[in-house]
Amino acid sequence: MLGIGAFKQRMPRSGEALPGRTQALPLHNTHLINGHPLRGEFTGLAQVQFGLGCFWGAERKFWNVPGVYTTAVGYAGGKTPNATYSEVCSGQTGHTEAVLVVYDAQAVSFEQLLRTFWESHDPTQGMQQGSDVGTQYRSAIYCSTQAQYDAAIASRDAYQQQLTAAGYGDITTEILYPAPTFYYAEDDHQQYLAKHPNGYCGLGGTGVSCPIGLDA
């Protein structure tokens, strides 16, 4: 049997992923900061999923952006339905830690969100982010529209030029459309750094400015 460490740098193959469960994990459907629901139809609003390392600090980055209606943390991009945190940490789900960002496109542009995303982590590190190592920490943008996907690809290419000039390697961010299923994480992980102000935050950007979203 493969040990947990075997899945730190590669995705589980068919038959290796944990089976998960059919029932969603319990969720207190109220955002601790703004009181908006975490799960719903969100009519008239846009959605995107971002993965940029540990989702505790990543979520805080986005709930502080004006125009963002709500945020939630969860697991996406893998094979295991309704996975738990411990299962995701095993590497045997294939999920990355993701932040669901629901926003008013009239109040904040997708390009502005992309700029926050790129500048808040190092997207060249593959299956890790800083000292956090594993497939769950990979960089990802999961898009809900073709327009988002096109903008994400364009932003990646523009940011790659800046990173290359600064001596960084190739961007490894996974960009997908349509977005995979977003499985909400356990309650304690939602708005974690608001509940635990001194909690761990491993986010660290490259210091390289992203050239998009400046005038949006």
Swiss-Prot record:
Alphabetically ordered keywords of this record: Oxidoreductase
Biological processes, Gene Ontology terms: cellular response to oxidative stress; protein modification process
A GO molecular-function descriptor: L-methionine-(S)-S-oxide reductase activity
Gene3D superfamilies documented for this protein: Peptide methionine sulphoxide reductase MsrA
InterPro entries membership: Met_Sox_Rdtase_MsrA_dom (IPR002569), Met_Sox_Rdtase_MsrA_sf (IPR036509), MsrA_MetSO_reductase (IPR050162)
Highest taxon above the source species: Bacteria
E.C. number(s) listed in UniProt: 1.8.4.11
Active-site residues, Swiss-Prot/TrEMBL: 54
GO CC field: cytoplasm
Family: Belongs to the MsrA Met sulfoxide reductase family.
Family annotation (HAMAP family): MsrA
Function: Has an important function as a repair enzyme for proteins that have been inactivated by oxidation. Catalyzes the reversible oxidation-reduction of methionine sulfoxide in proteins to methionine.
Entry protein name: Peptide methionine sulfoxide reductase MsrA
Source organism per UniProt: Xanthomonas campestris pv. campestris (strain 8004)
